[in-house]
Amino acid sequence: MKINILTLFPEMFDIFKHSIIGRARENGFLHIETVNIRDYTLNKHKKVDDYPYGGGAGMVMTPQPVVDAIKAVKEKNKGKVIFLGPRGKTFNQEMAKELSKEEELIFVCGHYEGIDQRVYKYFDLEISLGDFVLTGGEMACIPVIDSISRLVPGVLGSEESFQDESYYDGTLEYPQYTRPFEFEGEKVPEVLMSGHHENIRKWRRKQSLLITKERRPDMFEKIKLSKEDIKLLKSK
């Protein structure tokens, strides 16, 4: 997958040079490039923002440099243009799975009080992380790209790495344990030490369902419970 990020602050995405995403880039599974929107402004002072018409606090990103940056990237990349903003569709795991199937994606990060409305016709999709405000689109773009990238084949090395995680199948993840067997008087559940794979699978499924029911009842209501799920929930 190839990802282009249009931003005023390319250095904020240096985080993708490290850890799993960094290794995936080195191994050729991901290609992430940043494009500085400021490089496309025609303003001799490299200015990319101005006061809003009608008054109001803050500054608004001017349309020319953003549109020219999008057009330049689109000449070589045909991916969807995605804007991170509060009016967008709320991002979730299902959206991450769908976007991970794309060969190319182009992200546009807004800043200040937003982007001139006349730029919006160039966006194929608008995404929001939720009902809260961030200092810029970059802060929202990072987790979105990370969530999508880790689902790209080869990035994690194995599909099992993400299939057991929270949200993948509409439930929260079951509890995880590692050494030591006993810590501060609390022991690892015996079933995990049994070596009985079927019993371990059932225990994990039950815990996943119980945790989801307790902490995210909104998610639990959407789960299509199997006969086994119902039996597990009734068991002690």
UniProtKB/Swiss-Prot annotation:
Q: What is its main location?
A: cytoplasm
The GO cellular component terms are: cytosol
Asked if the keyword Cytoplasm belongs to this entry, the reply reads yes
GO molecular function, a single term? tRNA (guanine(37)-N1)-methyltransferase activity
| Alphabetical list of InterPro entries matching this protein | Alpha/beta_knot_MTases, tRNA_m1G_MeTrfase_C_sf, tRNA_m1G_MeTrfase_TrmD, tRNA_m1G_MTases_N, tRNA_MeTrfase_TRMD/TRM10
Localized where?
Cytoplasm
**What keywords sit in the KW lines?**
Cytoplasm, Methyltransferase, S-adenosyl-L-methionine, Transferase, tRNA processing
* Residue sites binding S-adenosyl-L-methionine per the record: 110, 129-134
Q: Does the keyword S-adenosyl-L-methionine apply?
A: yes
Q: Please give the catalytic activity noted in the UniProt record.
A: guanosine(37) in tRNA + S-adenosyl-L-methionine = N(1)-methylguanosine(37) in tRNA + S-adenosyl-L-homocysteine + H(+)
GO terms under biological process:
tRNA N1-guanine methylation
Enzyme type, top EC level: transferase
What Enzyme Commission number does this protein have?
2.1.1.228
Query: What is the similarity comment for this entry?
Result: Belongs to the RNA methyltransferase TrmD family.
UniProt function note: Specifically methylates guanosine-37 in various tRNAs.
Whom does it interact with, and what assembly results? Homodimer.
Q: What is this protein called?
A: tRNA (guanine-N(1)-)-methyltransferase
| Lineage of producing organism | Bacteria, Bacillati, Bacillota, Clostridia, Eubacteriales
